[in-house]
Amino acid sequence: MNTDARMGAGVSLKAEHYDQALACNLEGLWFEVHPENYMVGGPRLAWLNRIAERHPVSLHGVALSLAADAAPDQDHLQRLRALCDQIEPVLVSEHLAWSTWQGHYHPDLLPFPRSNEALQRIAENIQRCQEVLGRRISIENPSHYLQLQGHEWDEIDFLGELTRRTGCGLLLDINNVYVSAHNLGFSATAYLDRFPAQAITEVHLAGHSDDDQGSLLIDSHDAQVAEPVWALYRKLVSRVGPRPTLIERDDKLPPFTELLAERSIAQSIMTCPGVLP
């Protein structure tokens, strides 16, 4: 696990909070952004450059479409490489999903059957990305809403094999685990107990919501981290030790101080997971 020693708990960075992020001097604080919002330059990139001078920054992509039927878009990869060269992020990560297929774009992160063919294709795409970027990337475990047919691999084994073949890291999203466990009916604790600890480069904590019928949980990133997710996080840190941890928030954005309050809980758990903050 190669991560920046300065990284404790961080928060998602949104334009509404640029001023406060720049002024904040909390030890161990870092920020994560979606690189697609900064590739075109402009005022956003100027702000990010200033913040990156003071705090570690991580890039969490949503558009590489690693599980697609074709290689990642080369123009997009080159823009991502240019942003990496400029910002020097401490971590670069992407979702284990697809959003393009047979030349058509779908504005979502979509699931796929974990087949041998998918494993080979995704491993090749990860290797291409790492070669172009000149750095290791991390892959995030997905959230699930229904049981797909055609799986040939258990998810933990699939992720572990990707790390073995490509040397990539893993971004462990605990809210995704909790949501998926609820929706598909498996044990979140058992999943985390099997997750390959040595490959974890980053942890995500986020809020979720109920669907309209109330039967599914949605990985919505629009609420505070739920107590069951905090409980899973405490167990994880007790088992594997502290890892850079992000409070992920993308919608219904609260005041910056509220994000820092959640960040403080994560920081306390990283320091002493057995004590309730």
Swiss-Prot record:
Q: Which InterPro entries match?
A: MbnB/TglH/ChrH (IPR007801), Xyl_isomerase-like_sf (IPR036237)
Family the UniProt entry places it in: Belongs to the UPF0276 family.
The record ties this protein, via HAMAP family, to: UPF0276
* Cited PANTHER family: UPF0276 PROTEIN HI_1600
What's the protein name? Answer: UPF0276 protein PP_0992
Species assigned in the record: Pseudomonas putida (strain ATCC 47054 / DSM 6125 / CFBP 8728 / NCIMB 11950 / KT2440)
Q: What is the lineage of its organism?
A: Bacteria, Pseudomonadati, Pseudomonadota, Gammaproteobacteria, Pseudomonadales
